[in-house]
Every structure is written in C-alpha cells, then in structure tokens.
Amino acid sequence: MKKVEKKYRFGQMHSVEDFSRILGADGLDFPVSQDLSVLAQPFELYGKTVPNRLGIQPLEGFDGLPSGAPSDLIFRRYHRYASGGAGLIWYESIAISDDGRCNPLQMVINEETVGEIGRLIRESDQAAWESMGHKPYNVLQLTHSGRRSNNKNWEPTPLAVCENPYMDDHTSIDGSCGKIEIATDEKIEEIIEGFIHGAELAAEAGFDCVDVKVCHEYILRELLSAFTRRQWRYGHPRTRALFDIIDGIRRRVGGGIEICVRLNAYDCVPYPYGWGMVKKEGVMEPDLTEPVKLCNMLVERGVKLINLSTMMPRYRPYGTGLMAEHDDQPITPYAGVHDLLKATRDIKAQTPGGIFMCTGLTWLEQFGANVGAGGIEQGWFDIAGFGRQAFAYPDFAKDILCGKGMQRNKCCLTCDKCYDLIQIGHTTTGCVPRDQEVYLPLYRKYVQKK
C-alpha cells in the first residue's frame, strides 16, 4: 500500500475553528458543527428505530476460524462495538462460499456456521443493552471476493469478470497476483444463488438487514464496470446480477430481512475499466451519472440504505490513471476523503428517499465527530460511519453520546499497522497502538521480523 503523508497535525488543532481554517486554506471545505447532538438523534429505518446516527463500518479482523465460524476475537470485537454505543453496526464481510473468501480466516455463512453467527448477534445485542439500554441496528455484509479471492494457503485464486490492465497484476491484498479465471454465466448464477441463500441464513441468525456488497474490488462491483464485456448474460444490463440477487432475496425471505448495499461512488480506475468515471478512455475523473441512476433504481426497489465508498477512501479519483495503491508516490489522504464526502452529498441530493451512510471520517481523527455532525446537519449524509476508528476506539460513540466528544488520546492514529498485519504478516489484525495486549505481539512476530 502507498505510503501516507499526514500533512496535518490534528493534535495541534485546539478547536473546530482551527480545523476548518487550516484545511479550508487548502480548499477542503468539510461540513462541520460544534454541536454534536444531531449524532444522538434516533431515526426510522425500514420500520425500526435506530437509536442514534453513529455507525460502525464493516471492517474485517481476518480472525475467523478455519471453518468460517466466528472466533473468540470476533466475539470480543463485536461485544466491544455493541457496548460502545453505536446505533448501527455493519458487520464485516462474510463470504457466501469458501471460494469467495479473501483470506483463509474470513468468516463464511453456511449451515454449519450460522448457529455461532447467531450467538454473536445475541450476545452483542445483550452487551449493548447492558451498556446503553438500546439494541443496535445490525447489518451483515455478504460478499464474494472475486479477483481478491485467496485460498487457505493465502495463494491468490482470482475470479474476474473481464481483463483489467489497471488491476490484473495485483489480485491479492499483499500485491501478489494469481492466474485469473474469467467468470462464466454459470459461475455468476452460482454466486447469485449464494447471496440469496446467505440472506436466508442471515435472517435465521437474527440480522435486521443484509448488505449485498457492491464496493471495492469485489465481484459484484466489477460487474458494474464491465464495459469491455458485453456479449454475455451479465453484460447488458450490467446491473442484472445485482437485481437478480435483490429480487431473489425478496422472493425467498420476504419481509424476514431488509436489504441494503455498500456501493462505490466511483472506482479511481479510468473508463472502460472503472465505474462512476468519465467515459473517455484513460481519463481519471468521476462522473456520478450512473451511480445516481443506480441509487434511484435501488430506492425504487425498496433498498433505501446505501453506504457509499470507493476503492479506498484515501485515494482521489484523479491523477495518472493508475491504481494509486500500486505506484510509489506518497499520498495525503484528506483530499480523497473530501472528494468522497462531496460525492456522497451530490448522490444523496439526487436520490429522494435514500438513507446514506458516509465513509472516511477516521482520517479526520478527533474532528471526525464534528464533520459527521456537520454533514448530517447540512444534508450531506444521514449516518456518520467510522471504520478503523472502531478498531482503535470501540467506545467512541459512547463518549460522543455522553457529551465528551471524541478523545484524541483514544483515536485511531491512521498509522496503517492494522494493514501491515494483513499485507505483510498475513495474520489477524486490529489496532496495534491502542489494543497492544492482543495485537502488538502479532505485529512483532509477523511484521517486524519479516
């Protein structure tokens, strides 16, 4: 992963005014509010009450059991999230099949694992009730990792929709590459059935909602950007597989579970190999026309909750046209976060009835809460979503709700050591600086000794 240059010293910013002035001087006009009370407001979602507007993003710990069931570390993590006060918990990606795992320790949902996954939900809800007196709204993200798939030995086993010169040479999370298999009609049909059956099992486990994952570099997202492969069942319309899954869940599960999506607003990969980009070959510039159209189609089908992301929020959808993750130039992530939040604002403004969760606030450290509140007040999004912040600071929501704001000495340091554990160490991940008892020994063993 590219080296990050952290241009701003948030520890030297003593107020929201300092934050706005310093970042605003660089053209980064984040929405901000000193009043965080909007984050505590409950709201209605699919007929249920979500206790507040603070959400935890789906972030894998790479720490499931080889069987695909949750481990003790997963139980620990979600108990901490739930007792930490967030109103919406978006459970990390669970693969619909063994061949759809991005790593050998990713959870898999099937008849053998659903019982333990259900216990995870029940115990986490109990932890939330005991700590906060509320039940969080629980979303499960289902996935097939596609070109990011790896087998039990961490060897890449990529399944792609089409050739992509910007992505074909780095299919695994560590930058390595495997022999790419191009998906057939029959394979996509198998994946569609896997998502539908996964939703059935998610309902059995007790989730409120299931996320049909359409983001990052995974298989359903790639179907949206498959402009170069028209002559097959899923080439036109490119949304066919997504809507076959949604319609199949409705038929199979009915009202037993709601449906949402986590969706790339744009891909940071040029046309004709990227989604949400200007349709000029090799041009790195976003065009939100298709994402807006898709979001409206989703809302019309009753899929109202949409969580917008991109390949990675730190990267801007501008530049040389190469996947920024894989060249050597260091980046500053703040403009990428600003671009993504603006795209969320623009898509939400053109999608009546949609409920949008934002991405990228962890990069703003203790001011993430102020931007979350400002974004909700100003109509940029409806739910303030935090990802790696929850690894480092699982009770961030509780501190906000209790009037303390976000405590800088508990915040994510955006040091990327959690990524190092995955990419270099091929091991379980979490916050090395803030959760040292568990993760510092792993970091020393699997990263520093390599």
Tell what function each PLM region has.
Residues 1-450:
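Flavin-dependent oxidoreductase catalytic cores
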